Amino acid sequence: MALVKGKVNINEFIDLSKSEKFLPSMFTPVKSVMISKVDKILVHEDESLSEVNLLKGVKLIDGGYVHLAGLVVTGEWNLPDNCRGGVSVCLVDKRMERADEATLASYYTAAAKKRFQFKVVPNYNITTKDAEKAVWQVLVNIRNVKIAAGYCPLSLEFVSVCIVYKNIIKLGLREKITSVTDGGPMELSEEVVDEFMEEVPMSVRLAKFRSKTGKKFSSKSENNSGNNRPKPDKNQRKEKGLKVRVEKDNLIDNELETYVADSDSY
């Protein structure tokens, strides 16, 4: 059975100089580099859009920023060996209204691959205020897995590496902001994510899922209000899909270890 790596290494996502690691916080806008605690999603439906807390256990700074440097997603099929079918997993920033821009990364793997893992490098900042609103979601699309309703065929776990900032001033009297170096060890991951994006049409699925759930909500609101509002045009054009690529499950070589990441800081 193919098992996966169970420990998150900060150095796989970011390079910190010795000064950035050991200087007191008053000398740098980087207050801490942290590994979040594990957040888990149990998948019960063929298609679902669920909120995920990528900053679980991370202490945020009031009025500051958080940089999502990296993300490790681990999944396990709760099925017998050699089952058919597979799953597409898509990380979503729900703030973005265009589906293709909301789709941060997508990944596909077969159910026969009992356990899998992939890494993502989002590499962008959000404000503490936005982070407190739980802005990330996971779109899961299970295909051709025949299991009775009400059971859980798949479990997903998420751990992130993030940097907490007091401010984003790049140069100051005694400050220099840290960044992911161009030659960092995870440059390849950004290329891999691009391959996911070009082969897996998860942005199309996200647009359809949002449209479907939006119509259900709109219908309920109209029934509750009792207003005779005009029905939406059934001939309304559907959003065109974007081509995206898939990266097969080829990141996995090691044996899995049970691991819960506690917050870690410099």
Swiss-Prot record:
UniProt subcellular location: Host cytoplasm, Host cytoskeleton; Host cell junction, Host plasmodesma
Stretches the record annotates as Disordered: 211-244
Keyword Kinase belongs to the record: no
Assigned GO CC terms: host cell cytoplasm; host cell plasmodesma; host cytoskeleton
Extra information: The ToBRFV MVP has gained resistance to antiviral Tm-2(2) defense, thereby allowing it to spread from Jordan to most of the world tomato's cultures and pose a major threat to agriculture.
Name recorded for this polypeptide: Movement protein
Name of the gene: MP
UniProt-recorded Gene Ontology molecular function terms: DNA binding; RNA binding
Organism, as annotated: Tomato brown rugose fruit virus (isolate TOBRFV/Tomato/Jordan/Tom1-Jo/2015) (ToBRFV)
Assembly: Binds to host RBCS at the plasmodesmata; this interaction seems required for viral systemic movement.
Primary role: Transports viral genome to neighboring plant cells directly through plasmosdesmata, without any budding. The movement protein allows efficient cell to cell propagation, by bypassing the host cell wall barrier. Forms a ribonucleoprotein complex with viral RNA. Binds microtubules and modulates microtubule stability. Can bind double-stranded DNA. Evades host resistance (R) protein (e.g. tomato ToMV resistance protein TM-2(2), AC Q71BG9) in ToMV/TMV resistant plants.
Compositional bias (Basic and acidic residues): 230-244
GO biological process: transport of virus in host, cell to cell
Keyword Transport recorded: yes
